[in-house]
Amino acid sequence: MMVIRPVERRDVSALMQLASKTGGGLTSLPADEATLTSRIERALKTWRGELPKSEQGYVFVLEDSDTGSVAGICAIEVAVGLNDPWYNYRVGTLVHASKELNVYNALPTLFLSNDHTGSSELCTLFLDPDWRKEGNGYLLSKSRFMFMAAFRDKFNEKVVAEMRGVIDEHGYSPFWESLGERFFSMEFSRADYLCGTGQKAFIAELMPKHPIYTHFLSEEAQAVIGEVHPQTAPARTVLEKEGFRYRNYIDIFDGGPTLECDIDRVRAIRKSRLLDVVEGQPAPGEFPACLVANENYHHFRAMLIRTDPDTQRLVLTAAQLDALKCHAGDRVRLVRLCAEEKTA
């Protein structure tokens, strides 16, 4: 049974295994044990209420409850950019025109931006390639919305998600090679590693401060602005179906898109509802896949089940109740997956 749960100290070796499979470009999941251990400790302190909002971050893992295997990771940063600046580029337009010469040029331009400061961020989404089946990707990504819906007061009005940009299997990023490398004088993998391990001072020190005309970049770099890594395309589709949109903000390293949505307009948050749970044998029939989660802050659990999404009382087996860490009579949160999202 696949279940989402809060990260624990014992997960560090499993997270190292996941980090070794990302192929690069997933800045917040570096293959560095000290960084991952620190990330776990920060998450545990967040749950214990020991950190200011500017440092809070939740980390969850997807676990096979039968074997204890960790199949994926996802996370939420509560408020970005309140300690260290949170940079991206805004893709805008500058117009150069001369009536006398009958010349008019509208030029796509990159503007350095901190516009998302204070937003909550969905991040560190990675599912082991061996587990990319049976709806695990939907569960891993959308479980965060169930947590946010249950504990809405912990998060801010806007939610953003940086999508991994186009990088090949050798770590080559066209956007970085055409822009970032000229200012940072290092390979993409090095910059990505420094950022992922918390060494971010170099960004503020070396970032270009003035607008950049995209026409000065290579054609290859221009083509990947706002585009995602092929492995990230499904994750982008999932978020867009939940209401997230690309508003012309991109990552400063690889040019990948930043998606955003007002938290209360996220479909799964808006349409999820609470209902009582009872123990029994669920009725047979062809029912759609639904997310179900408990309302336990410290022992949060979420999983996928098949049930009538309009039911007034949710029937779960003893094994499902145990996996969700809840009992008959408890309140749980339920929402259907989007109709076109198949889990088989």
Swiss-Prot record:
Kinase as UniProt keyword: no
Listed GO biological process terms: arginine catabolic process to glutamate; arginine catabolic process to succinate
Pathway: Amino-acid degradation; L-arginine degradation via AST pathway; L-glutamate and succinate from L-arginine: step 1/5
Protein keywords: Acyltransferase, Arginine metabolism, Transferase
Catalytic site positions: H229 (proton donor)
Catalytic activity: succinyl-CoA + L-arginine = N(2)-succinyl-L-arginine + CoA + H(+)
Chain positions recorded as succinyl-CoA binding sites: L125
E.C. code: 2.3.1.109
Family to which the UniProt record says this protein belongs: Belongs to the arginine N-succinyltransferase family.
Name of this chain's protein: Arginine N-succinyltransferase
Source species taxonomy: Bacteria, Pseudomonadati, Pseudomonadota, Gammaproteobacteria, Enterobacterales
